[in-house]
């Protein structure tokens, strides 16, 4: 089984020293928050530029604020632009976890999740869902993850066991949480991790999926669009793009 260690970040982590991250021999990937709803994360410009510069493989995640199908479709189209611009090797992830979302009920939530996955998946990016044990058990229909071709949309599963250590490789100390959902592609095992280069606590993850195989690409694609080209693509949506 593949085990790759990574973190996920947003504006909450402040200014990150990406050179220190790049020197960490255990860090295999970073999942960057790209947006909340259809508003770009305020730290995204710097984070994506630095991920590209330091050649750290990355995924993107999108925090939802929508409660209607029309709203989720707009968020998905917004996310698709990021995916087409930046080709995230570790997937694009939909994070729907607010109280107003839970109030929608299982059937509606499942419909919204599935719609986002379908739209973003059309870009060729591996589109998945970030969620926790309670939502999986009570608020998401299992069929959400099933594709028509028999494959599955990947799951990024958050569950925090009682682990004393908080470094990247400490997840091995208690794998029972991961094993409770063996289909999880990524397990987020703590929100209190510490890593050189980031001054705050940070979420830490273990990836068990070969995303290069899912997308048909090498882990690090041979070609990206340039940062300038990506900025132009994002400007079509009225966002700032990448600050050079």
Residue ranges and their predicted role:
Residues 90-174:
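Catalytic domains of cell-wall/extracellular-matrix polysaccharide-remodeling enzymes
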Residues 1-126:
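Substrate-binding cleft of extracellular glycoside hydrolase catalytic domains
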Residues 39, 67, 136, 164, ...:
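Flexible, glycine-rich phosphate/dinucleotide-binding loops
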Residues 220-244:
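Short, low-complexity, charged amphipathic interaction modules
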Residues 82-85, 120, 178, 214-215, ...:
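Alpha-helix C-terminal capping segments
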Residues 1-11, 16, 24, 143-225:
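Functionally critical loop-and-helix segments that line ligand-binding/catalytic clefts
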Residues 17, 68-71, 105, 109, ...:
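General structural signal for secondary-structure boundaries
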């Amino acid at each position: 089984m593949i085990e790759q260690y990574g973190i996920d970040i947003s504006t909450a982590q402040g200014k990150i020293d990406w050179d220190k991250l790049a020197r960490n021999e255990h860090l295999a990937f970073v999942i960057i928050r790209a947006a909340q709803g259809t508003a770009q994360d305020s730290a995204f410009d710097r984070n994506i530029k630095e991920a590209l510069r330091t050649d750290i493989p990355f995924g993107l995640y999108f925090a939802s604020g929508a409660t209607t199908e029309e709203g989720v479709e707009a968020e998905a189209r917004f996310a698709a632009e990021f995916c087409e611009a930046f080709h995230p090797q570790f997937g694009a992830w939909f994070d729907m976890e607010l109280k107003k979302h839970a109030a929608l009920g299982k059937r509606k939530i499942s419909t919204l999740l599935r719609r986002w996955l379908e739209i973003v998946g059309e870009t060729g990016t591996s589109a998945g869902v970030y969620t926790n044990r309670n939502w999986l058990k009570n608020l998401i229909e299992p069929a959400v993850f099933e594709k028509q071709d028999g494959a599955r949309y990947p799951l990024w599963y958050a569950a925090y066991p009682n682990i004393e250590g908080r470094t990247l490789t400490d997840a091995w100390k208690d794998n029972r949480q991961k094993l409770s959902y063996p289909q999880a592609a990524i397990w987020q095992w703590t929100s209190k991790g510490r890593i050189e280069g980031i001054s705050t606590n940070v979420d830490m993850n273990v990836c068990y999926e070969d995303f290069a195989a899912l997308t048909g690409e090498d882990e690090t694609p041979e070609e990206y669009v340039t940062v300038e080209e990506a900025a132009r693509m994002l400007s079509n949506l009225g966002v700032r793009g990448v600050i050079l």
